[in-house]
Amino acid sequence: MLNFLPGNPQDLKPKITVIGVGGAGGNAVNNMIASRLEGVEFIVANTDAQAINQSRTERRVQLGTTVAQGLGAGSRPEIGRAAAEESLEEVIGQIAGANMVFITAGMGGGTGSGAAPVIARAARDHGILTVGVVTKPFHFEGAHRMRTAEGAIEELSQYVDTLIIIPNQNLFRVATERTTFADAFKMADDVLYSGVRGVTDLMIMPGLINLDFADIRTVMSEMGKAMMGTGEAEGDKRAIEAAEAAISNPLLDDTSMKGAKGVLINITGGMDMTLFEVDEAANRIRDEVDPEANIIFGSTFDEKLNGKMRVSVVATGIASEAAAQPKPTVVSLNTPQAQPQPRVAAGGTAGAGFRPAVVTAQAAPAAAVAVAQAQPQMEARTVAQPAPQPAHQPVVTAQVRVQPAAARPAQQPMAETFRPDPQLRLDPVLERPVPATTSLQADFRADPDMGHLSQAVSHIAETAQAAPQPQRQPEIQRQQAPQPQRQPEPEARRSGGLFGLLRRPAAAQPAPQPQRHEPAPMAQQPRQEPARMGNMATRSEPSVARAGEDLDIPAFLRRQAN
């Protein structure tokens, strides 16, 4: 007894449908129709009525007649989503009965970004194997459009079994200066064309190793991110060259076949294709994927390819491997937290406002602090010189030696810190004489030009009566009370000569410190310094305020002039 299959045997063939959503999807469908791809049905769905009328397919769906009114989505994904929801029943009627659906769209706009996820969800809910092939915008289209595209791709990936992403920016990898704008987009559409043709050839074209649709579903069902590639070559090394061209598609989203879990390989050639060439091409692709990957291989013949070989590859399950690799890169970001801790420990003894000053002051030696406190002559000279003033005066006022910058705003603590301890730090003076004070006085008295000295004496005699400046004397007496110890210096000069002061600056200071407190003779020193304007112009101006300290110098100069 014979059993006949009911119906037409043609109805049992797998049905593959390509639906283009939006303007970019409609253009891809038109290019595939122009390439005369067989065994595939084409559908276009758009909110723009004008774009639908230019389509080459007769199966058209006007999305959102009420929402968009045939005017498009205006680059607003929410309008495209609402339009697809409104016309979803009509879309389902068009794709009913299909075993596999390729949804192609351009991400970043309104219709493709909003309607493609809705259509993919409906197709997958009806048990249809759904593959998404989408493009990303160029860089010159702006960051806003790129963010819209990335959000739409993330949403679309939840409703498709396999997703293939083609960035338009990668067209510059294959385009030249003479490549037209239309030809560049046709290159992107060829990725979709080669992927669909690789699947249909396995099921339609005759061959020694044919595959059924169940094998394709096994490789592509719920595999996530995928890549498609096709390579064609001729010559002695056509097998290797075609395989390498298929696995290195420059237009895809920087994907690699490393770690792919499912691989579909289709090798097509003429009747002159040898077994060695098929083995060589298949092994080249197998070396790139996971050793445990599910590889489905098929080979067909095409009389038009005599002397050539074409290798088509669909690698799926790439997203799961790529997501596992970036995990170790998140671990080395907590080390900089230990940097502020040493700063707090270094300045813990001082106040919060003086922490930077304490850190810099710790490098100064303790002997320098003792020398600065035991020499009132140097204090008077440092006040006259504005440069070293912030370096010595704060150290004298601070007995703790930790906060040298705390005494900068006021000079009154200088007299308070000097009273209880006037002579305890005189020993370091014998060890470290200050050359700055002696060199200043030596340069001042070793001038051989006696004409300048006589002019200075006459000038001081005239100006001593005109400008006594009594208002500054109590300030100097209050701030620098122990400074009268410099008065015995003229006695040392009388006994030891002009250069005796250079040799004994420290020995003459400690004996007569508490004896004399005369502010009047100290007011004559500013008269001597303005007399010598050639070398001491910068030092004479601030020393006028210390007139009570420098009156002994003109008396000495008068005796030298006589």
UniProtKB/Swiss-Prot annotation:
Cell compartment(s), UniProt: Cytoplasm
GO biological process per UniProt: division septum assembly; FtsZ-dependent cytokinesis; microtubule-based process; protein polymerization
A GO molecular function held by the record: GTPase activity
Region (Disordered), start-end ranges: 404-428, 462-562
InterPro entries: Cell_div_FtsZ, Cell_div_FtsZ_CS, FtsZ/CetZ, FtsZ_C, Tub_FtsZ_C, Tubulin/FtsZ-like_C, Tubulin/FtsZ_2-layer-sand-dom, Tubulin/FtsZ_GTPase_sf
Sequence ranges of Basic and acidic residues compositional bias: 418-428
Keywords per UniProt: Cell cycle, Cell division, Cytoplasm, GTP-binding, Nucleotide-binding, Septation
Keyword Metal-binding: no
Keyword Nucleotide-binding part of the UniProt annotation: yes
Pfam families linked: FtsZ_C, Tubulin
A GO cellular component entry from the record: cytoplasm
Amino acid composition bias (Low complexity), ranges on this chain: 404-413, 464-486, 500-510
Function: Essential cell division protein that forms a contractile ring structure (Z ring) at the future cell division site. The regulation of the ring assembly controls the timing and the location of cell division. One of the functions of the FtsZ ring is to recruit other cell division proteins to the septum to produce a new cell wall between the dividing cells. Binds GTP and shows GTPase activity. Mild overexpression impairs cell division, leading to very elongated cells. Isolated protein forms filaments and bundles in the presence of GTP.
Assembly mode: Homodimer. Polymerizes to form a dynamic ring structure in a strictly GTP-dependent manner. Interacts directly with several other division proteins. Interacts with FtsZ-like protein (also called FtsZm).
Family per similarity comment: Belongs to the FtsZ family.
The protein's name in its UniProt record: Cell division protein FtsZ
